[in-house]
Amino acid sequence: MPLLRGRCPARRHYRRLALLGLQPAPRFAHSGPPRQRPLSAAEMAVGLVVFFTTFLTPAAYVLGNLKQFRRN
């Protein structure tokens, strides 16, 4: 087992990081307290509409003009 311990590529990688003085980054700490009130139904509906409109509008445009795209 001692030979295996010295040949582990992950261990060599961490040794290289230590030689460079790099440390793994700390996890992100939230900058503020959590939201105190839950989202209302209207806020959630607006968010979903904006989200789906953002992604589905370009797809609908491409599918609607597919014949033009095929000609080029």
Curated annotation (Swiss-Prot):
UniProt-listed Gene3D superfamilies: Cytochrome c oxidase, subunit 8
Pfam families linked: COX8 (PF02285)
Keyword Amino-acid biosynthesis: no
Main localization (coarse): mitochondrion
Transit sequence range: 1-29
CC per GO annotation: mitochondrial inner membrane; mitochondrion; respiratory chain complex IV
Alphabetically ordered keywords of this record: Membrane, Mitochondrion, Mitochondrion inner membrane, Transit peptide, Transmembrane, Transmembrane helix
CDD domains the UniProt entry points to: Cyt_c_Oxidase_VIII
Subcellular location: Mitochondrion inner membrane
Topological region Mitochondrial intermembrane: 65-72
Membrane topology summary: Single-pass membrane protein
Protein origin, superkingdom: Eukaryota
Mitochondrial matrix topological domain: 30-40
Tissue-specific expression: It is not yet known where COX8C is expressed.
Subunit: Component of the cytochrome c oxidase (complex IV, CIV), a multisubunit enzyme composed of 14 subunits. The complex is composed of a catalytic core of 3 subunits MT-CO1, MT-CO2 and MT-CO3, encoded in the mitochondrial DNA, and 11 supernumerary subunits COX4I1 (or COX4I2), COX5A, COX5B, COX6A1 (or COX6A2), COX6B1 (or COX6B2), COX6C, COX7A2 (or COX7A1), COX7B, COX7C, COX8A and NDUFA4, which are encoded in the nuclear genome.
Family statement drawn from the similarity comment of this UniProt entry: Belongs to the cytochrome c oxidase VIII family.
Function description: Component of the cytochrome c oxidase, the last enzyme in the mitochondrial electron transport chain which drives oxidative phosphorylation. The respiratory chain contains 3 multisubunit complexes succinate dehydrogenase (complex II, CII), ubiquinol-cytochrome c oxidoreductase (cytochrome b-c1 complex, complex III, CIII) and cytochrome c oxidase (complex IV, CIV), that cooperate to transfer electrons derived from NADH and succinate to molecular oxygen, creating an electrochemical gradient over the inner membrane that drives transmembrane transport and the ATP synthase.
Name of the protein in its database record: Cytochrome c oxidase subunit 8C, mitochondrial
Species of the source: Homo sapiens (Human)
Gene name of the encoded protein: COX8C
